[in-house]
Amino acid sequence: MADRDDIPDYHRTAVPASTQIPKQGEKLNILLVTRGHPFDRDGFFDIFDGNPQIQYSNVEHPAAQYMFTPEMADKFDCYVQYDMPGIKFGSDTPEYFEPPEFYKEGLRAMGEAGSPLVLLHHCAAAWPAWPEWAEIVGGQFLYTPMQSRGIDCPDSGYNID
């Protein structure tokens, strides 16, 4: 079982949002996974609040990492990810971190089980130190020049202020 030492230091001090697993019924049960970048929270959640066919829970990193198991995924119809973990922005260049091993194993097992994921926008920039993530997403956004799929690549063109 994972413990606190498996969570990167920059996530340990984070205060995650609370979540409840919705009751299964006629509505779609969606797990919204967020954190790692600023966004219009009201606008984002309004999309889901305004759809009477959806009920959702929101979980933020690092707590979200514990939700990535086939057993947990069975409680939801789909995960919608609008997260960007694995990057710590500072005064200079960003620092990159791999996810904990328990998260990697859980995500792989979800893939093998056919658990549906919807990966939005910022997910392409998540986990840059973990090459397998680019394969899962089907692409990669690079904040700095680095290798992607074994090829030296320039950054993707975003100017970090």
Residue ranges and their predicted role:
Residues 49, 112-115, 138:
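Sec-exported extracytoplasmic/periplasmic mature domains
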Residues 2-78:
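Aromatic-Pro/Gly-enriched surface loop or interdomain linker
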Residues 52-56, 78-81, 102-103, 139-143, ...:
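Short, surface-exposed linear patches
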